[in-house]
């Protein structure tokens, strides 16, 4: 089976008229079948790419268990589900890793919005059961809300990878969550209406593979129902799609001109340059928002750190006073 891949190493213009081709097929899609864009976000090493492979049903995204991210650009593959909808899975690099520059992140967010032509039908936050919740992950939800607005949580699904760990320990996800669940995670699950799925991306059991993907698709369908069938879009996404439509329209007009091929090529080059310039401007806008969000997160972290230090100092002072009082009482007893 072949698959439809699109990577964005530069500003590429998606074709609105291009048919779905080379799709990883369970059955042939018809032109009327809808596309559901599912974007995977999360920390490097949490298993985003492996989860994408599980959804698609074969290894299409490069995936390795290592600290350094394998995915360096947004990539997308499509699969046709047995029930009809085409699932367009968008794998992202570690957009919320602290070591990644704001410039890189902003460009990849714009690339992600380019790939999600119809809008976002689900945002999958990938967390690993094998690691503690990191500061990056705690910042991720705030960053998503700052970049896209509070409505983004209406499209959020949490996927927990390393499901085999639960099986090895004879635990359920509920057991895991009830055993000292971090406040951040409680908040995320509350905001997204408890939409969560456990993925075992290493399993060879075809039944388990199918079941976990089906559970995810049930959540995607529930989001569609709850949002009235409207995918998530924001001002930035609409501007990107309007720009794409403009370029396609002008490209068609150039093709219809009765001029030499060399002139057509020159006009198309100018059009491509204007598109790239506009995409760069949008990336700069996104970078500014991201930097402001990162600065706000850092201020909050520093405030929490200061509060903890004050609490520690206060506790130390209280303990010291208690020890001094105890010593005084002891001395009084000795005198008596």
Swiss-Prot record:
Q: Name one GO biological process term.
A: cellular response to heat
State the residue spans of region: G1. 42-49
- Read off the Pfam families from this record: AIG1 (PF04548)
User: Which residues does the annotated region (G4) include?
Assistant: 161-164
Induction notes from the record: Up-regulated by brassinolides. Down-regulated by 2-aminoethoxyvinylglycine (AVG), high CO(2), isoxaben, and propiconazole treatments.
Cellular-component GO terms for this entry: endoplasmic reticulum; plasma membrane
Q: Where is this region: G5?
A: 200-202
Cysteines paired by S-S bonds: none
Q: Which family does it belong to?
A: Belongs to the TRAFAC class TrmE-Era-EngA-EngB-Septin-like GTPase superfamily. AIG1/Toc34/Toc159-like paraseptin GTPase family. IAN subfamily.
Please report the name of this protein according to its UniProt entry: Immune-associated nucleotide-binding protein 6
